[in-house]
Swiss-Prot record:
Name of the molecule in the record: Protein phosphatase PHLPP-like protein
Matching InterPro entries: Leu-rich_rpt, Leu-rich_rpt_typical-subtyp, LRR_dom_sf, LRR_domain-containing, PPM-type-like_dom_sf, PPM-type_phosphatase-like_dom, RA_PHLPP-like
Organism: Caenorhabditis elegans
SMART domains the UniProt entry points to: LRR_BAC (SM00364), LRR_TYP (SM00369), PP2Cc (SM00332)
PPM-type phosphatase domain span: 761-987
Keyword Repeat belongs to the record: yes
Region (Disordered): 1038-1077
Gene that encodes it: phlp-2
Keyword Iron tagged: no
Enzyme Commission number(s) of this protein: 3.1.3.16
LRR repeats: 56-79, 192-213, 227-250, 251-276, 286-309, 310-332, 333-355, 356-378, 380-403, 419-445, 451-476, 483-506, 507-529, 531-551, 552-574, 576-601, 623-646, 648-672, 674-692, 693-714, 716-743
């Protein structure tokens, strides 16, 4: 094409064939090197041939995701392709064409001619010649030098040196020309009398080269050493459409060649053999090749010329579009490894059986309906047959095969196998299998049968070492004889009520997983095992742990969310190797006695959400190796002990949602303490932590701390100080000594009243967990919220966060679906290989809008129930798997798409289009009186917590901030150590109002009989489990009020305190509490007053006292949340 023409058109768009019927648009076209571009105007009738004619090029090439190139046919309309592409991007789960989706489509089409769109979708004029970030150096180096050949005196000559491929050509002034083959020579630096020189020598001769520009020496040395030392060429991810010349000329004698993830093709049938070299077929010229990786290119047929490479040992042709294998493949006699996975094969030639040296053949993720007959004649160790259409295995008899991978096939309901030598069998994700009988496979060691419909599993135990049968319908397991060699048994997510008793007799069992069943007990002798190291039996119905009287080797015991009421006596003494114990969400009131006299290795202790009191504190402080303690949601009145300071390794302490009135001063003496959580207690002050050098997070929100008078000395490395929902305003001037540190500390102080948005109160909680990176971020701009989950990539989430914040500020009323797509388009180069889950929520006065793609989920509270409205895609179901396969993707053993990606719905991952799409879910919810709120969070919240748990937490706590924090506490109490982020929106109920009466109104306008029913109607208490006692004249000073628990109603609070009896007067006051018949679980509180005209002053004083005392007894935060209109 004409470069001058391209440069001239880049300044102003040109018009190419005015539209006839359809609307014209601008297209951006790139030069073949990708360095320049121009815009043209065209319509759907404009063809590639017409564009080529105008720009004097032979072809238009399309690139998606800055990855594969595709040459377009001459009669193709580029604009039509672009519109179809954008239409796919704007698709929603509903696939409905609405006015909003049309607007989103129009918006993204208007963005397509932006240079930033290059990373997603681009057209090139001619055949692309992109210079990628290459390890294959194609630069030609040329320098004026002085050279000396050999060791003779006075032989220095002026010359010009040219370095290209693996050669250095020396051109002297007398027109002598000599080429040096670098790969056959040793390269180093030599200190000569004339200066530093590049020395090249072999067995016969030595060359010294001194550069006139001395600083050039290092560049030439590096380049020469790269050429010299390796016969391995890595040209992967180079955006190659042709193989570079320096590879094909075989000067390097390349043995290992990596051409993965390019756009290489075989020579088209119409291409003449005299055409330029560079096709896959031309690799036969490189006779030295032993290993070739051509995976993830655009090969349509098996390159038959490769069968001429007599030294070839390994050939990888996976993730191409090959539909047949030629019989000539039998010529590759030395071939040991052949990977043909993720192609379009349905048969293999019988001649493959002649490859007697073949050790590995991978034909997974093709279209085989039966096992190719040639496999029965090969001496392979493993059959890799995952992702095909195989229904059964017909062939029986003795065979050498030992391992078979049959994942994601269509195997029949009853599975049997008669190949006796099998040692490893993988049947995962065959959704029709209900029965597996393999008692005849006496050599079977490892079996994977997860995610089937298994109701019956029978195995031989003679050689069995590992059994994985999670996510099935099993209530029993038959293994005969006793599996003496069994090491791992995983049976989670089944229907077991009791585990087999023979488990206790397995002498080598080290790992047992049986969570998410219906277990009522563990095997009686399970703790007598001397080999068992880990037991995971959480989310069951276990009521007790069997007694055991001798020490064992157990290191991990996870039993959260069961029905335990106690632990065995001497539990900690006879488990000396226990390092992690989780008994959260049980009914335990007291930990068993432990005096510290015996050695205890326990490092992680999680006892959240039980009935523990301060009586268990002496037990805990005797465990000197503890690093994490979680005692949240218990009944602790204090956490103090004289030995508390001996927990020198403690890093994380959670005391939230207890009854604490103070924190022990000795907590500041713990040298390793990093995180302290004590929210939702009754604390009135924060102790001195100035000397805690490691402490970076303190959460004392939702307490009774008076922030206006708080004298807080901040530790030097404090980053987060959360004082939300306390009284007063926190003033950092109270600790001026730490002024230099304040710029690093994030003080969080959000009053609930300030977080009011169209009748919703807002609660937010987030944590990095045990990770150093924050990969989940949240954005709020006015009435719009954004959630970004970058998976394991913190840079991606922060990049999207910055863009979304700035974009929302400029386009606050833009449709949230269009915003989501703009985030997709703005990822740029990072979006080619990386992606993120994004959810956007917009709150209106009368409706809620939610748009989401990825793993974020949301549930709405309506009529005392929580219902999922957007469910993030955690697992790949059958329908989604079919779509992925149609898009030429595959799924690995861990259900990761193309071996990397966790979800097929994300923004980003441009290079995997159309396997991964930004397809979104959209909900438009009309607000009414039945809707109570919304919970939004990342996927692990919904994976680990049940909808019932979340519903209970939401409806048993009136503060959305407390709800968010308790959800986070519960998540961490279940051993989740990753990032979490939670948003809670809660509808505000009408304020409780006490209508008192001024003197004038009492005397002149209102009578008590009229006022009393009015008070009854307006005062509604939204705390269902709280019952106020009757008022008595002189009650004692009350003890701390217990925190409200979601498991059982809290005991009633003590009587309202009063320091002196009320004055005797003609006014009488009575507080009556009666259950409301109109509100579910609510109570109506009425204050009945009888006034006389002579007691105005005393009645006002009495009213003020009653108001303050009632607010304090109700634990309202801040105390003046209840308003009194006097």
């Amino acid at each position: 094409m004409n470069n001058e023409q391209l440069q001239s058109t880049s300044s102003s768009p040109s018009t190419l064939l005015k539209p006839i019927e359809k609307k014209s648009r601008f297209l951006r076209l790139y030069s073949s090197d990708g360095q320049r571009s121009t815009r043209i105007e065209c319509d759907e009738h404009t063809t590639c041939a017409q564009i080529c004619q105008q720009f004097s090029c032979d072809v238009i090439t399309l690139q998606i995701g800055n990855y594969h190139f595709r040459q377009l046919k001459s009669d193709t309309s580029p604009l039509a392709i672009l519109q179809d592409f954008c239409r796919i991007l704007t698709m929603s789960d509903e696939n409905l064409e609405t006015e909003s989706t049309s607007k989103a489509l129009e918006d993204i089409l208007s963005y397509t001619d932006s240079p930033a769109f290059r990373h997603i979708f681009s057209f090139f004029l001619g055949r692309p010649r992109i210079r990628a970030k290459s390890t294959l150096n194609l630069d030609i180096l040329s320098e004026e030098v002085v050279i000396r050949k050999g060791k003779l005196i006075h032989t220095w000559q002026n010359a010009r040196a040219v370095f290209y491929n693996s050669n250095i050509r020396l051109q002297t002034k007398n027109n002598q020309d000599e080429a040096l083959q670098i790969r056959n020579m040793k390269v180093d630096v030599h200190e000569s009398k004339r200066g530093r020189a590049l020395r090249l020598k072999d067995d016969d001769v030595c060359y010294l080269i001194i550069f006139q520009r001395p600083n050039i020496l290092e560049a030439w040395l590096t380049r020469a050493q790269q050429v010299e030392k390796s016969n391995h060429v890595d040209a992967s991810d180079e955006q190659l459409t042709l193989i570079p010349e320096q590879i094909l000329n075989n000067e390097a004698r390349v043995q290992i060649l990596n051409l993965r993830r390019n756009s290489l093709i075989s020579r088209p049938p119409t291409e003449k053999s005299m055409a330029p070299l560079g096709y896959i077929d031309d690799l036969y010229r490189v006779h030295s090749l032993q290993v070739i990786d051509l995976s993830a290119n655009q090969i349509l047929s098996f390159p038959i010329q490769l069968t001429l490479l007599s030294h070839l040992r390994q050939l990888n042709l996976s993730s191409n579009y090959i539909s047949s294998v030629p019989s000539e493949c039998s010529n590759m006699r030395r071939l040991q490894y052949l990977n043909l996975s993720n192609n379009q094969l349905d048969t293999l030639p019988d001649s493959i059986s002649e490859l007697q040296n073949l050790q590995s053949l991978d034909i997974s993720f093709n279209q085989f309906s039966q096992i190719p007959p040639c496999l029965f004649h090969l001496t392979l160790e493993m059959w890799r047959l995952a992702g095909n259409n195989i229904e059964k295995i017909d062939r029986v008899g003795e065979m050498q095969i030992q391992k078979i991978d049959l994942r994601r096939n269509v195997l029949d309901t009853s599975f049997r196998l008669d190949i006796e030598n099998i040692t490893h069998l993988d049947l995962r994700d065959n959704s029709m299998i209900s029965t597996v009988h393999l008692t005849n496979l006496r050599f079977l060691k490892v079996i994977h049968c997860e995610r089937l419909q298994l109701s019956s599993l029978h195995l031989s135990g003679e050689s069995l070492t590992h059994v994985y049968a999670d996510h099935n319908l099993l209530d029993s397991l038959v293994v005969m004889p006793l599996p003496q060699n069994l090491q791992t048994l995983s049976l989670s997510f089944n229907h077991f009520r009791n585990l087999p008793d023979w488990i206790s007799d397995c002498p080598n069992l080290t790992f047992l997983r049986a969570n998410n069943n219906s277990l009522v007990a563990l095997p009686e002798r399970i703790f007598y095992s001397q080999s068992l190291r880990s037991i995971f039996a959480f989310i069951n119905e276990i009521e007790h742990i069997p007694d055991f009287g001798e020490e064992n080797c157990l290191e991990t015991l996870i039993l959260y969310k069961n029905k335990l009421s106690s632990l065995p006596k001497h539990f900690f003494s006879i488990l000396p190797r226990l390092r992690q114990l989780n008994i959260s969400s049980n009914f335990i009131e007291l930990l068993p006695y432990f005096d510290g006299s015996s050695f205890c290795r326990l490092q992680i202790l999680r006892c959240a959400n039980n009935y523990l009191t301060e009586n268990s504190v002496p037990v805990i402080v005797n465990m000197k190796h503890l690093k994490i303690i979680d005692l949240s949601h218990n009944r602790l009145n204090s956490f103090d002990d004289s030995a508390l300071s001996s927990l020198e390794l403690l890093e994380d302490l959670n005391l939230s949602s207890n009854r604490l009135t103070r924190l022990a001063d000795c907590l500041a003496l713990l040298p390793c303490l990093q995180v302290l959580r004590a929210h939702s207690n009754q604390l009135v002050h924060v102790p001195e932590f100035r000397a805690s050098n490691q402490l970076h997070t303190i959460d004392v929100s939702s307490n009774n701390i008076s922030l206006g008078t708080l004298q807080f000395k901040a530790p030097p490395n404090l980053r987060h100080f959360d004082v939300t929902c306390n009284s007063g305003d926190f003033d950092t001037e109270n600790f001026p000594e730490n002024a230099k540190m304040h710029s690093k500390m994030n003080t969080i102080n959000i009053s609930e009243g300030s977080q009011n948005l169209f009748g919703f109160q807002i609660g937010v909680s987030g944590s990095r967990g045990m990770k150093n990176k924050q990969c989940i971020r949240q954005v709020r701009v006015e009435n719009t919220f954004g959630f970004i989950d970058g998976g394991s990539n913190s840079y991606m989430s922060s990049s999207i966060c910055r863009f979304m914040t700035s974009y929302l500020k400029e386009n606050v009323s833009m449709d949230i679906r269009s915003i989501l797509l703009r985030c997709h388009c703005e990822l740029g180069e990072e979006g080619e290989r990386l992606g993120a889950s994004v959810m956007i929520i917009r709150v209106h006065e009368k409706r809620l809008e939610i748009a989401s793609t990825g793993t974020m989920s949301a549930a709405i509270a309506r009529n005392q129930k929580l219902k999922m409205i957007i469910n993030g895609r955690y697992e790949i179901d059958d329908d989604e798997y079919s779509r992925i396969r149609e898009a030429h993707g595959f799924v690995d053993e861990e259900n990761r798409i193309n071996g990397v990606i966790g979800s097929s719905r994300q923004i980003g991952h441009f290079s995997t289009f159309p396997v991964v799409l930004p397809t979104h879910s959209y909900r438009n919810i009309q607000l009414n009186e039945q809707i109570e709120g919304l919970i939004v969070g990342n996927n692990m919240i919904w994976n680990m917590l049940s909808i019932d748990d979340l519903n209970s937490t939401f409806h048993n706590n009136r503060s959305p901030i407390v709800v968010a924090k308790k959800i986070q506490d519960q998540l961490q109490s279940y051993d989740y150590g990753g990032n979490s982020n939670i948003l809670v929106l809660r509808r505000i109920k009408p304020q409780m109002t006490f209508n008192g009466f001024s003197t004038s109104s009492t005397k002149n306008q209102v009578t008590p009989d009229i006022a009393i029913p009015k008070i009854d109607e307006q005062l509604v208490l939204a705390v269902p489990a709280l019952i106020l006692p009757e008022y008595h004249p002189s009650p004692p000073v009350p003890p701390p009020i217990p925190a409200i628990r979601h498991r059982t109603p809290s005991p009633p609070p003590p009587p309202l305190p009063s320091s002196t009896p009320p004055p005797v007067s003609s006014e009488h006051e009575e507080i009556n509490v009666r259950q409301s018949s109109t509100l579910s679980g609510g109570y109506t509180l009425s204050i009945d007053r009888f006034y006389s005209s002579s007691s105005t002053v005393s009645s006002r004083k009495q009213f003020n006292e009653t108001r303050d005392l009632l607010s304090k007894s109700l634990k309202l935060s801040p105390p003046n949340t209840v308003t009194f209109n006097i």
